[in-house]
Swiss-Prot record:
Record has Lyase as a keyword: no
Protein purpose: Activator of cell division through the inhibition of FtsZ GTPase activity, therefore promoting FtsZ assembly into bundles of protofilaments necessary for the formation of the division Z ring. It is recruited early at mid-cell but it is not essential for cell division.
Gene name per UniProt: zapA
Family to which this protein belongs: Belongs to the ZapA family. Type 2 subfamily.
SUPFAM superfamilies for the chain: Cell division protein ZapA-like (SSF102829)
Quaternary structure and interacting proteins, as annotated: Homodimer. Interacts with FtsZ.
Protein name, entry field: Cell division protein ZapA
UniProt key word Cell cycle: yes
Gene Ontology annotations for the cellular component aspect, listed alphabetically: cell division site; cell septum; cytosol; plasma membrane
Lineage: Bacteria, Bacillati, Bacillota, Bacilli, Bacillales
Record's subcellular location: Cytoplasm
InterPro entries: Bac_CellDiv_Activator (IPR053712), Cell_div_ZapA-like (IPR007838), Cell_div_ZapA-like_sf (IPR036192), Cell_div_ZapA_firmicutes (IPR023688)
Residue ranges that the Swiss-Prot or TrEMBL entry lists as coiled coil: 64-87
Superkingdom of the organism of origin: Bacteria
Keywords of the record: Cell cycle, Cell division, Coiled coil, Cytoplasm, Septation
Length: 87
């Protein structure tokens, strides 16, 4: 079994540099990091007294919430598509 090529990218998230290693393209990794950075900054603006750990947890909760809503919408649309296909 062939091993996938790994991409190593250094990104900046909320003023900290992280080296991310993954199988996605460097542009994809940078996009993910940018979304996390943007969400952390958005939450920090509304809650300036949060320490970095709590900010990170709230960011994760917000991003997973968005993911679940999108997944539910995707599943709903997929179910609708299958229903229309079967008619």
């Amino acid at each position: 079994m062939a091993e996938q090529q790994k991409t190593r990218v250094t990104v900046d998230i909320y003023g900290q540099q992280y080296t991310i290693v993954g199988t996605e393209s460097s542009s994809h990794i940078r996009l993910v990091a940018s979304i996390v950075d943007d969400k952390m900054r958005e939450i920090s603006e509304k809650n300036p007294t949060l320490d970095i750990s709590k900010l990170a947890v709230l960011t994760a909760i917000n991003i997973v919430h968005d993911y679940i809503k999108l997944k539910e919408e995707y599943d709903r649309l997929l179910q609708k598509l299958h229903k229309e296909k079967d008619e």
